[in-house]
Design a protein with these regions (language model features):
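Active-site acidic/histidine proton-transfer and metal-coordination neighborhood
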Residues: 1-145
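Histidine-acidic metal/acid-base catalytic patches
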Residues: 1-4, 72-76, 91-95, 99-103, ...
Length: 227
């Protein structure tokens, strides 16, 4: 009983980012979509208002109103923070909490940055196999692990998801299975979970998780809104 795993992220100022929360597909379903060219046209100070407006009255996780009310101040705070400094802060945080995690058997499962590249100049540090491996080596306690989100890491087609699964085997505590479809450089839609509907080989990903000894929790992630 109780909490034995925490999925969290270390993305400063705001969480995941999309340019469209309800892109209409030919079959009438809607999906979350990202287009860097559209993001580049948005004033960072107003992105919270635009995201919440698109949410049609719902409060989006990672875009909570109390946090977004301070977005200008947060941007100012992180304006001079480098990726190296953010990484050092993450390592410091994890080292400080590991004794408590050991006492209560809590696995920490960091979620990759979404998308897997810097947005509005903010540092992003959990976005590739190299960066994930770097963190796991810096804090080698097996309770320090990751949430393997195929859609977040897979947003960058240069990320080899199968390779990453084997590179960090034993440290994947949570898996988010999400398919995406590429439409060009830093441009993608979220897709249904069938491999044929997107750009990710979901069957191969699940097989790699099984073959690498994964015994954590899997959650089907996002997909389409069909009603």
């Amino acid at each position: 009983a109780g909490i034995d795993m925490i999925c969290y992220n270390f993305m400063p100022v705001f969480d995941w980012t999309r340019s469209d929360l309800a892109k209409v597909l030919p079959d009438g379903s809607t999906v979350l979509s990202y287009d860097q060219a559209l993001i580049d046209k948005i004033n960072p100070d107003s992105i919270a208002d635009q995201m919440n407006k698109k949410a049609q009255g719902s409060e989006l996780p990672g875009w909570e109103s109390e946090r977004m009310a301070q977005i200008k101040e947060l941007f100012a705070i992180y304006e001079t923070v480098t990726e190296e400094q953010l990484f050092d802060n993450l390592v410091y945080f994890l080292n400080k909490i590991m004794p408590t995690c050991e006492k209560y058997g809590i696995r920490m499962a960091i979620h990759p940055d979404d998308p897997a590249w810097p947005v509005f100049g903010l540092p992003r540090i959990i976005n590739s196999e190299a960066n994930i491996t770097k963190l796991l080596e810096a804090v080698p306690n097996p309770l320090n692990g990751i949430t393997f989100c195929t859609g977040s890491l897979g947003s960058n087609p240069e990320n080899d998801l199968i390779s990453t699964i084997y590179a960090v085997k034993g440290r994947i505590h949570f898996a988010h299975l999400r398919n995406i479809k590429y439409h060009g450089y830093q441009k993608f839609d979220e897709a249904s979970h069938l491999s044929s509907d997107g750009s990710l080989d979901m069957v191969a990903i699940i097989k790699a998780l099984r073959d690498s000894g994964f015994d954590g929790i899997i959650r089907p992630d996002h997909g389409r809104q069909i009603w």
